[in-house]
Amino acid sequence: MARVIIIGPAHPLRGGLATFNQRLAKAFADEGHESSLLSFSLQYPDFIFPGTTQYSSEPAPENLLIHTKINSINPFNWIRTGNWLRKQQADLIIVRFWLPLMGPALGTILRRARKNKKTKIICIADNVIPHEKRPGDKPFTRYFLKSCDAFITMSEKVMSDLRLFEKTKPALQVAHPLYDNFGAILSKTEARIHLGLPADEKIILFFGFIRKYKGLDLLFDAMSLPAIKNTGIRLLVAGEFYEEEKGYQAQIDQ
């Protein structure tokens, strides 16, 4: 049995990373390992968070130990958390990396944790080069990557981005697993009835947070082309705006 600690967002934080991390912790536990999660007491300051809320309204997952400790903007917290993590004597730390802004906090925590000369650190890199560039991206990313022993990516693009920064450490590309924790699978017919959608209509689904880099504006432009309009295809947008809605609404009105 190994002792595994997963570092990244977890309940009460919401989003895909939290869902993934919690399911991964359960998978380790199901295999007989001791698993827990180390999450954030402060992930993003409110003034830089573009959505409505960082927190989930869902109940906490059962049978998962979640330590809510990391303050992403407090260096004193990084040292305390790193010292705590070092004392846990984990066999394996799995850390998520998705944004250079997290590099200083996570890199410092991991450097202190690995001083126990026991713990191995594997990074699951969701992004290495961010979708939206900011000052400090490259040094923050380098600082973080140097604290890891090996890497997992879930796309060829992220793997190639990783190799721009880290050319020699072991890295493996795997497919993003399918989630199995959202209830029973519905057939297309059942799902359409539940959502009130016509059974035989052709539908394109845009699903998820709405941010500029995701290209919803380009999809709207494409849907307005006569060659598309004449097909009778319908666009269904299901997501939360992470930026001003006005521009998108103007496109719809046109």
Place the predicted regions along the sequence by residue.
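N-terminal subdomain of nucleotide-sugar transferases
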Residues: 1-45, 49, 59, 88, ...
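Short donor-sugar binding/catalytic loops of nucleotide-sugar-dependent glycosyltransferases
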Residues: 10-12, 207-211, 226, 240-242
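Glycosyltransferase donor-sugar binding loop
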Residues: 40-44, 233-249
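Short N-terminal targeting/anchoring amphipathic segment
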Residues: 66-71, 80-104, 119-120
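Nucleotide-sugar donor phosphate/pyrophosphate-binding loop at the beta->alpha transition
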Residues: 117-122, 128-147, 156, 160, ...
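Donor nucleotide-sugar binding/catalytic pocket of nucleotide-sugar-dependent glycosyltransferases
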Residues: 146-186
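A short helix/loop element that forms part of the nucleotide-sugar donor recognition site in Leloir-type
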Residues: 183-197, 250
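Conserved donor-binding/catalytic core segment of Leloir-type glycosyltransferases
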Residues: 198-214, 220-223, 236
